[in-house]
């Protein structure tokens, strides 16, 4: 077959390149609406539950933080996904697709970096593994302060802090 004048042959190769993306959801929680007391599906189906933020960072330059319905999920089609505690993020993603909260896509693989850290003999928590591997201390104070707070009731300053926190978690997960 002939070569199209409108495309560079190198662009065909780029279409087939597999990338890796870190995905991290931020969700509402309080004492009664909690994964610890309700389990995963009980938590997701609780009337107070809200997945109000997702951060997605890719090795090809993607850096997104915002409401999950605003992310271009099909962009991740066929790629590798990482989450630090994938049993939460992957299950929430699938649950959200089934509920019509956001569109689905088919990923190549979805790996848990928390499980990987534990397998390698590192602390399972992102905070612990980041400290040990990268000699980097990260604060989980923002996450602790998010308890019982709805996105719409947070101050603009606190929302910016939540977004920065979420983005940092995905950046470290990808790292």
PLM regions and their residue ranges:
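Active-site-proximal helix-loop-helix substrate-binding element of RNase H-like nuclease domains
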Residues: 46-68, 73, 78-175
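Ser/Thr-glycine-rich phosphate-binding loops at phosphate-binding pockets of nucleotides
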Residues: 25-31, 42-44, 85
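Cytochrome P450 core scaffold surrounding the K-helix E-X-X-R motif
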Residues: 31-34, 65
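N-terminal accessory regions of nucleic-acid-interacting proteins
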Residues: 2-32
